[in-house]
């Protein structure tokens, strides 16, 4: 089940070791409203069908073609792809480490979870929003938003990704170690 946990970022607190959430909700309408108030897009799409183990990128993109085209058109995104992470992925440790560092992008980060789950952590002013996205969830993080992503130590997800550039995922790391003070997906 999708979940939103809102924490103070701890920058004004003497005790930064174990933040206490200001809000925790698993109600989709409340998640959407809280994120929208902060400029973050969140939608839930019906999960069309189970993803076969052998499903490749073209199969995934075809299964969600109408929804993908709508997001691509509405957001002006140039390209779309699908990424699948498994517990035995050879680069899982390096990728998790990279994604866990706070960063920004020059473009929106838009993800739709076809299967599995991931934790988007958004550092917005004096708040940190931990957004657990699961199968059927779409999140749109605007360009320039400080955030990090946790796919877990044993990642198991497939996500559709939209981009404004042909290069794909390009991050600017902030150097802030804030992500170390907040819960992870595991």
Swiss-Prot record:
Subunit-level organization: Monomer.
Pathway membership of this protein? Amino-acid biosynthesis; L-methionine biosynthesis via salvage pathway; L-methionine from S-methyl-5-thio-alpha-D-ribose 1-phosphate: step 5/6
Look up the record and name the cofactor or cofactors this protein needs. Answer: Fe(2+); Ni(2+)
Q: Tell me the GO BP annotations in alphabetical order.
A: L-methionine salvage from methylthioadenosine; L-methionine salvage from S-adenosylmethionine
Which Enzyme Commission number(s) are on file for it?
1.13.11.54, 1.13.11.53
Q: What role is this protein assigned?
A: Catalyzes 2 different reactions between oxygen and the acireductone 1,2-dihydroxy-3-keto-5-methylthiopentene (DHK-MTPene) depending upon the metal bound in the active site. Fe-containing acireductone dioxygenase (Fe-ARD) produces formate and 2-keto-4-methylthiobutyrate (KMTB), the alpha-ketoacid precursor of methionine in the methionine recycle pathway. Ni-containing acireductone dioxygenase (Ni-ARD) produces methylthiopropionate, carbon monoxide and formate, and does not lie on the methionine recycle pathway.
Q: Where is this site: May play a role in transmitting local conformational changes?
A: 108
Identify the residue position(s) of the site Important to generate the dianion: 111
The protein here is known as Acireductone dioxygenase
Q: Which reactions is this enzyme annotated as catalysing?
A: 1,2-dihydroxy-5-(methylsulfanyl)pent-1-en-3-one + O2 = 3-(methylsulfanyl)propanoate + CO + formate + 2 H(+); 1,2-dihydroxy-5-(methylsulfanyl)pent-1-en-3-one + O2 = 4-methylsulfanyl-2-oxobutanoate + formate + 2 H(+)
Which InterPro entries does the UniProt record give?
Answer: ARD, ARD_bac, RmlC-like_jellyroll, RmlC_Cupin_sf
Q: Which domain of life does the UniProt lineage start with?
A: Bacteria
Q: Which residues bind Ni(2+)?
A: 103, 105, 109, 147
The residues the entry assigns to the signal sequence are none
Tell me which UniProt keywords the record has, alphabetically.
Amino-acid biosynthesis, Dioxygenase, Iron, Metal-binding, Methionine biosynthesis, Nickel, Oxidoreductase
Region annotation Disordered: where it falls in the sequence: 1-21
Q: Give the organism the record lists.
A: Synechococcus sp. (strain CC9902)
